[in-house]
Amino acid sequence: MKKISLKTLRKSFNLNKSKEETDFMVVQQPSLASDFGKDDSLFGSCYGKDMASCDINGEDEKGGKNRSKSESLMGTLKRRLSAKQKSKGKAGTPSGSSADEDTFSSSSAPIVFKDVRAQRPIRSTSLRSHHYSPTPWPLRPTNSEETCIKMEVRVKALVHSSSPSPALNGVRKDFHDLQSETACQEQANSLKSSASHNGDLHLHLDEHVPVVIGLMPQDYIQYTVPLDEGMYPLEGSRSYCLDSSSPMEVSAVPPQVGGRSFPEDESQVDQDLVVAPEIFVDQSVNGLLIGTTGVMLQSPRAGQDDVPPLSPLLPPMQNNQIQRNFSGLTGTEAHVAESMRCHLNFDPNSAPGVARVYDSVQSSGPMVVTSLTEELKKLAKQGWYWGPITRWEAEGKLANVPDGSFLVRDSSDDRYLLSLSFRSHGKTLHTRIEHSNGRFSFYEQPDVEGHTSIVDLIEHSIRDSENGAFCYSRSRLPGSATYPVRLTNPVSRFMQVRSLQYLCRFVIRQYTRIDLIQKLPLPNKMKDYLQEKHY
């Protein structure tokens, strides 16, 4: 009978106790599996089922083939401590069961509970790296199909648009260039060959059908942009230039020898008239005819001259306002002319004469409009230009001056821009300045004998008057006297000193449009004074 020492019993007792404790501690391990289950609920969609459903119990069952059950940390420490005590004691031979358990404990040390917990940061790190990768979620096969379908429908919608012309700004591309990607090629071909259910969603597109990429169909709808108010062509727009076939331009009196002839104002003829001048509505009655040269003089008793003209910076009366138009120009040229007019800060509606000039130059192009605007600005700096004064005021300025004195003023006739008032044989006469195609003249055909500048016309007439009369004037009535015309003494408005109030208004009106005066930070009385007709 074999003897069993006390030390051997103690060792057997300790091993059995640790084995019982190990069996008891196994109950805590399912909590680890539940912890991993929480992570799987968050990231499990990115991995397979085998990785998402991993748990500790499955590993314990696999390890149970080599050992009875897993052991806890406390049981492992106790076994290692007992193993050290065995090596120190070296007394007695351990039992076979205890040796097998020690061998199992040392060999299974890398996969004990402490090492199992180390797998969690490794797995979470892989999840984090996957979550923040450049392509975290792989595209499903349906995504590429949907992309191709959406692009196909978009292209078909663009083809449905209302016939975009080649002049439209847009990127054009053949449909076969759109199919360069292999992912969408098969889907596009299938959509081409497939029949449409509703008849509008799909089109059978050929390979070389041009389509518009990047713009919606409404971007290619052609529409006409309306022009600004006042620039529409007028239907039956009237001309303000006298027709050469008009009977009032035909003279029955032969021209005088020694030069051209001018008609003059005969105040006595008007005084002999019994009928009031307001009856003569026709301009051919109120105006006296020039000779064969076609220069028009104004009658001093004309009914329309009783109404004072407006200032160059004042708009015309509402009942006589003429709508500005550039019907003779193309769309681009009319826009250039209007832009140039606004850029020069000059309003063609400001005065009767200035407004009418724009109608006469509408067929001459924007350069004529620009040159005319600059010429009118240059004219305002001349001393002999008196602006919007009436014929009665002009006669008052020329009352006590010698023959050859003259001044230029705004014409009160709707068909003309400027008028010339001059002295001849002790009388004050008036004639209008013709304008056509950017040229100014005293005669009917300014294209032949005219000047591009009003200042040049007056200066040229002054030089011609040094050697005598450069032309003659006469009345339209047969047998009327003829008067020589000389321009030698310009009457300057700068020679008369006006009040400070008048000069201030003159400067303000030079740099401020009439429609902007109400916006000036001035009292209402001063605004009314600035808006008076004459200055």
Swiss-Prot record:
Region (Disordered): 80-105
Domain SOCS box residues, every copy: 486-535
InterPro entries the record matches: SH2, SH2_dom_sf, SOCS6_SH2, SOCS6_SOCS, SOCS_box, SOCS_box-like_dom_sf
One example GO MF annotation: 1-phosphatidylinositol-3-kinase regulator activity
Top-level lineage group: Eukaryota
Gene Ontology annotations for the cellular component aspect, listed alphabetically: immunological synapse; phosphatidylinositol 3-kinase complex
Keywords: Growth regulation, SH2 domain, Signal transduction inhibitor, Ubl conjugation pathway
GO biological process: intracellular signal transduction; negative regulation of signal transduction; negative regulation of T cell activation; phosphatidylinositol phosphate biosynthetic process; proteasomal protein catabolic process; protein ubiquitination; regulation of growth
Free-text comment on this protein's domains from its UniProt entry: The SOCS box domain mediates the interaction with the Elongin BC complex, an adapter module in different E3 ubiquitin ligase complexes.
Known function: SOCS family proteins form part of a classical negative feedback system that regulates cytokine signal transduction. May be a substrate recognition component of a SCF-like ECS (Elongin BC-CUL2/5-SOCS-box protein) E3 ubiquitin-protein ligase complex which mediates the ubiquitination and subsequent proteasomal degradation of target proteins. Regulates KIT degradation by ubiquitination of the tyrosine-phosphorylated receptor.
Subunit structure of this chain's protein: Interacts with RBCK1. Interacts with phosphorylated IRS4. Interacts with KIT (phosphorylated). Interacts with PIM3.
Protein name, entry field: Suppressor of cytokine signaling 6
Organism: Pongo abelii (Sumatran orangutan)
